């Protein structure tokens, strides 16, 4: 499963079927394999331009099943072959219980090959630079490790938001508070206060 910015902690970062973040600031694998997939199941997804780029080329070979609570989002950007309007907590199990299990190990292996390409080309320099100043990605990854990928991530908007999205790890759901959509600058501090009040037992 790939995620978008607002769904980052839906699966733990190290889950074997978590293939990274989709979109212009996302990972190589989801963006490449999106062009190869024959079925795209979009759960609570708006298909905004930061994810799709040119909608005409997004998942061009795929049938689309779109699950969304807001009917206005269905077919707004990407046409849905199957539209499911409602709370995904109820509607998603109705779909998954009808799916026949198959071996997708080769498909997942394709993502892992992309991971290796991206690591060598981009991530190694961002997170483990050989020399020079501390990089933003390096700092984000160090903080994530210090909190054992178990902290609630709150970001403001800008380059640090994207670095945090790429290099912060998650073990639990509901671990990201960030401003998508309008991307409101100045969001970080009041959101962090709210996150601590809402989850006082978490860092």
Question: Where are the regions that the model predicts?
Answer:
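Generic beta-strand/beta-sheet core signal
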Residues: 2-5, 42-44, 67-68, 154-158, ...
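Conserved catalytic cysteine-centered active-site region
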Residues: 2-16, 169, 201
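Residue-level signal for threonine
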Residues: 2-4, 27, 135
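Active-site diphosphate/adenylate-binding microenvironment
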Residues: 7, 115-199
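Glycine-rich, acidic loop regions that bind phosphate or pyrophosphate groups
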Residues: 8-112
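Short, well-ordered coil loops that connect the C-terminus of an alpha-helix to the N-terminus
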Residues: 60, 80, 101, 149, ...
